Amino acid sequence: SNGKLTYTNIVTVYVTLPQPKTFYNDVTQDGGICGNNLVKDALDTLKAMPDYNSTLVPLFDALTVDNNNYVIACNVFFAGANSGVWAMGLWPHSSALYYAGAQELTPGGKKIFPYQITDIGNRLAIGTFAHENGHMLCGFPDLYDYDYDSVGGAGVFCLMGSGGGDLNPSQVCAYLKYAAGWATITELTSSSSLLATVSSRGTNFNHFYRFQKPGSSTEYFLAEGRYKTGRDAGLPGCGLLIWHIDELGDN
């Protein structure tokens, strides 16, 4: 975001839930139901701690809420492997407590409704966490093909594609940066002639170039510079990246 998004989490203690993992990781159940059960029981267990009101509630006062008094982001990690079954059982996802209902976090005040869950093992993996926060915090869509029947999608060049590498996930692509208000663009036309500078750092960071398809307000080409440094160290290549954007497409 180049400093336009500041995101700070309050980390609580580990808690042991009242049911075995097999209860929450029921692969015959929709992942949203299992996630709701996990998050609700985790919050109930946390709030039952003797020092909850004196120790954690004062920290939670700093959390940002929306107009409904819902905390804008709640991250829950569960130990061990995920279900391995797409969207079933304990599958990492971002959603809300549609089944359990909003849960009170502070007495008469802030509530938990949006959440994301991610499995955590013995590695400092942040890729899935970052991807799911793209959904929860920023409203970013998935930019990969759900049924893998085409070669479309953003691939490893976007966090919301397949760029959520465990230890060092890729940046968000130019399209989503601009949609989030993190970027500026220069509009190009068929008669444009300019010497453009694209950079992964410095004054031109998050500045892109757009050529609109004639007669369309939702389809265009977007150019950015990507380099194998920082969050992009794992990219297969670097240089000028030109995206073909169709905002009315689906995955």
PLM-predicted stretches and their roles:
Residues 1-108:
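Active-site-proximal segments of metallohydrolase catalytic domains
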Residues 73-237, 243-248:
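Extracellular hydrolytic enzyme modules, especially secreted metalloproteases
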